[in-house]
């Protein structure tokens, strides 16, 4: 892809913006950066690019006539909605508009494995990456996991494996992006404030399969009825995984073991009790990872070893500490109700739950109903605090306390905890009302817990 002397507009200067601009400059493009944030808020990012000749248009989206030269390409950061008037006007002029993973795909070489879904993406992406690394493959783990795909694209070679965690925001802007193996782990309502409807959200997720050919592989959760029905339209070869059903072909659980059945030949992978990371949600992640890596020829011994040793990822049911018999678990990655339900299901001790955060328009009925006698008390904070309280009381869960912030929630939970209890941060909400991302929220939780020991 020749971008030398091409005029490229980057809209959105968030996490992917810096590596994106660096690569575009490296390729000789004339780069214009536009962000609705003002210069004051972006100074630190701009310092990192001070050696590059970049034109900035900050504090607003401009009129097209204000641009100094005709545009050859527009690259939109994932956090920028594609239906804002500025982007609509650019599209109406016939200018190509793509996202960061589309650009990275056009520049990269190698075997692409892409993973999406509402929950489990980060754990599964990390696990798949670890399996390929243990198999001796040069592996890049990128995407919505904290390392922009574009930052590694020019380093890749034809033999590399690129494992991508792909969000709905990233997938809605693809054009040619085609993974050799694509997977949807599950699908429940999320990000409806951005996508407006469940249909739009689902369509964005299914974009992961839209360019696949008959020789490519689509890995799908058989237990998700909606996914199973919609998968009939997929052109790629389908490989199902299931925690609940004995499949005629695919990867599933039989007699407490993960098995793979293909062309009448059954292979035993591992006992589910030997998987290091606990919980049914992690069993599903292990099934998906097994299906994906087997599809690309990884030996069973390597998969088995990795499932026995992989310790999970930070901020996902991460045990932080045990203080005077009270366990503290950081599940800050629980950014929607379904993710937090899975977090609660994986804990077998009485729970003091901390929930709340940015309002994505979620419904919390199923979340509250999932307490199932496990949750002794819930502390709520953030934009969704009142909604959570009202939903809990409507469903006859009355042990709820509203607090101002995470610090107060942790301290009050610890005050009433007894030996054998678990203080669980699993917010069921995004972090953006108080924190830049869920990682910062999780790190703050761990700092608060550490201070309890002092």
Curated annotation (Swiss-Prot):
State a single Pfam family of this protein.
Answer: MurD-like_N
Reactions that this protein is recorded to catalyse: UDP-N-acetyl-alpha-D-muramoyl-L-alanine + D-glutamate + ATP = UDP-N-acetyl-alpha-D-muramoyl-L-alanyl-D-glutamate + ADP + phosphate + H(+)
Q: Which residues bind ATP?
A: 117-123
Q: Look up the EC number in the record and give it.
A: 6.3.2.9
The highest taxon in the source lineage is Bacteria
The molecular function GO annotations come to: ATP binding; UDP-N-acetylmuramoylalanine-D-glutamate ligase activity
Q: What's the protein called, per UniProt?
A: UDP-N-acetylmuramoylalanine--D-glutamate ligase
Name its species.
Answer: Alkaliphilus oremlandii (strain OhILAs) (Clostridium oremlandii (strain OhILAs))
Upper taxonomic lineage: Bacteria, Bacillati, Bacillota, Clostridia, Peptostreptococcales
């Amino acid at each position: 892809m020749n971008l030398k002397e091409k005029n490229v507009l980057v809209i959105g200067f968030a996490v992917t913006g810096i590596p994106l601009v660096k690569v575009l400059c490296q390729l000789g493009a004339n780069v214009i950066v536009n962000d609705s944030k003002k210069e004051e808020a972006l100074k630190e990012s701009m310092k990192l690019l001070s050696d590059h000749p970049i034109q900035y248009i900050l504090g607003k989206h401009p009129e097209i006539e204000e641009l100094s030269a005709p545009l050859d390409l527009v690259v939109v950061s994932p956090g920028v909605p594609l239906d804002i008037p500025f982007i609509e006007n650019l599209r109406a002029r016939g200018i190509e508009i793509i996202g960061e993973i589309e650009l990275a795909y056009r520049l990269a070489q190698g075997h692409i494995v892409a993973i999406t879904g509402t929950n489990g993406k980060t754990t599964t992406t990390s696990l798949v990456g670890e399996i390929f690394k243990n198999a001796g493959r040069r592996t890049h783990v990128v995407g919505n996991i904290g390392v922009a795909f574009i930052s590694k694209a020019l380093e890749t070679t034809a033999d590399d494996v690129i494992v991508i965690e792909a969000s709905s925001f990233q997938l809605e802007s693809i054009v040619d992006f085609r993974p050799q193996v694509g997977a949807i782990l599950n699908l429940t309502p999320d990000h409806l404030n951005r996508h407006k409807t469940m249909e739009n959200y689902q369509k964005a997720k299914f974009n992961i399969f839209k360019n696949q050919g008959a020789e490519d592989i689509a890995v799908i959760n058989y237990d998700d009825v909606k996914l199973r029905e919609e998968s009939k339209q997929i052109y790629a070869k389908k490989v199902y995984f299931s925690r609940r059903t004995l499949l005629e072909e695919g990867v599933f659980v039989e007699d407490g073991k993960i098995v793979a059945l293909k062309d009448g030949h059954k292979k035993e992978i591992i006992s589910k009790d030997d998987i290091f990371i606990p919980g049914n949600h992690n069993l599903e992640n292990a099934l998906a990872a097994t299906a994906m890596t087997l599809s690309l020829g990884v030996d069973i011994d390597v998969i088995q070893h990795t499932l026995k040793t992989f310790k999970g990822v930070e901020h996902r049911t991460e045990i932080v500490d045990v203080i005077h018999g009270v366990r503290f678990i950081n599940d800050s990655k629980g950014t929607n109700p379904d993710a937090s339900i899975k977090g609660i299901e994986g804990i077998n001790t009485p729970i003091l739950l901390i929930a709340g955060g940015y309002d994505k328009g979620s419904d919390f009925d199923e979340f509250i109903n999932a307490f199932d006698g496990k949750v002794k008390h819930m502390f709520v904070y953030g934009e969704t605090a009142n909604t959570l309280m009202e939903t809990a009381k409507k469903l006859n869960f009355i042990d709820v306390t509203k607090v101002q912030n995470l610090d107060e929630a942790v301290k009050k939970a610890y005050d009433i905890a007894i030996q054998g209890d678990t203080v669980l941060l699993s917010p069921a909400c995004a972090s953006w009302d108080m924190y830049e991302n869920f990682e910062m929220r999780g790190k703050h939780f761990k700092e608060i817990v550490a201070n309890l020991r002092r």
